[in-house]
UniProtKB/Swiss-Prot annotation:
This is Ras-related protein RabN1. A lipid is attached at residue 216 (S-geranylgeranyl cysteine). It comes from Dictyostelium discoideum. Its main location: membrane. A motif (Effector region) lies at residues 37-44.
Length: 216
């Protein structure tokens, strides 16, 4: 494959095993729903996207089931520019474990040499399997909104952008990844400026992603 983009960014998919993130990953990669077999290690694909008249290359990484065994190794998180944090809107455990995944993201980034967890890459929250009708056991919109508010109140991220998707019906796949791609580029450019300006104490970097989208 011929790479035309000068900037190569990394986007990672995180969330519980069987949360639906691999189905979303495969749908965005153009693979047919339900027939793809995961490899034994991390799965990835490359895509070049035009962002504001700039061609940017993106390496998308999925865990491919590795999260079943233990926490992911720090290599998976190294040089990530944005995270896609997924949960199954019908699965209580996958929703409760969202905090665990954010904690792991921050800890692995610190292990990889990031100076502060406040400099961790931004994330977009995706609720999967929206094609399945909600029941009393499903995660309510009110609980999701409260989780987003708690994250914002803790200043983990300025604003949580949330989307509900269905890989089976190809519903709401492109829009979140358009936002994710822009967040990744913003983060990459900010970190590049920070690295070039270590001696400038007035430089501030944050996860303030003021891009219009569905949000909590």
């Amino acid at each position: 494959m011929e790479y035309k983009a000068n900037k190569k960014l990394k986007i990672i998919m995180i969330g519980d095993y069987n949360s639906g993130k691999t189905a979303i990953f495969n749908e965005f990669a153009g693979r047919k729903f339900g027939i793809y077999t995961c490899p034994s290690t991390f799965d990835l694909f490359y895509k070049e996207i035009m962002i504001d008249d700039e061609l940017v290359g993106y390496h998308f990484w999925d865990t491919a089931g590795q999260e079943r065994f233990t926490s992911l190794n720090r290599h998976f998180y190294r040089n990530a520019n944005c995270c896609v944090l997924c949960f199954d809107i019908h699965n209580e455990e996958s929703f409760k474990n969202l905090d665990k995944w954010i904690t792991e993201l921050h800890s692995k980034c610190l292990e990889n040499g990031l100076e502060s967890e406040k400099l961790s890459p931004p994330f977009v929250l995706i609720g999967t399997k929206s094609d399945i009708p909600r029941t009393d056991k499903s995660i309510s919109n009110e609980r999701i909104e409260q989780w987003c508010k708690n994250i914002e109140d803790q200043r983990i991220i300025d604003k949580v952008h949330y989307f509900e998707t269905s890989a089976k019906n190809s519903k709401n796949i492109k829009e979140p990844f358009n936002i994710i791609s822009k967040f990744a580029l913003n983060y990459f450019n900010s970190m590049q400026k920070l690295n070039e300006s270590k001696l400038n104490p007035t430089l501030e970097i944050s996860n303030n992603n003021n891009i219009k989208s569905s949000s909590c």
